[in-house]
């Protein structure tokens, strides 16, 4: 009996070691990056310094070592063989193309925000995660970094905007179609139009919060019906974030931030801010498509 127990233990230990083994050389080959293994945590991490762009923060030139290095760390998964977490250092004109590459690869985007004040050019940080086969995860990371190289190769000079600026004319947005598509009753001001849709949350104090306390999705339109800007904010559950991001990016809407507005609320919400350009009808249907990915 003791012999049987010992053999069982050895087999179990062997299986655990096998499961925990991260193939660093394979990850290096698939990502094209050099990495290192933290043996105590069983994590293999690859890094990619942004030495291709000169960034100053508060007038001081930042070396990549001080926080301008993209990274991805691989560890054994629970439900699937491997998990990955990472942070990509991006310029403004790289963010949305890289986000699409990440989402198309099956990885998740979990945050998008700044780490500095007074940085020139402005730098954004996209946090990513995923679980699956190590090959798929590593290829997804590489696709994102290759997209950065592609953009900088085609346009070494950083873009100053999404495209041509909106014509400097008075706004004349017709809100009726927006209300009809979204099922809202919006507000007009100086030719602009805004709609707000609320959700419910219970705060840490037990207080109820809804639309007027900031638990809302909104969209504001300016320009003309034929050529408009839309900017706004989506409030989403954590389980809805990836579907909403994919829907907005599929329709050409730019994501400009993903973060929290609250702490301790139930259910837990994330907020994503967006910016789009096009005919009002097209933009409205893009927003409707993303809203359809959220709970009613």
What are these regions (language model features)?
Residues 1-2:
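N-terminal secretory signal peptides that target proteins for export/translocation
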Residues 5-15:
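Bacterial N-terminal signal peptides
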Residues 20-122, 129-269, 275-296:
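Long, contiguous binding/interaction regions
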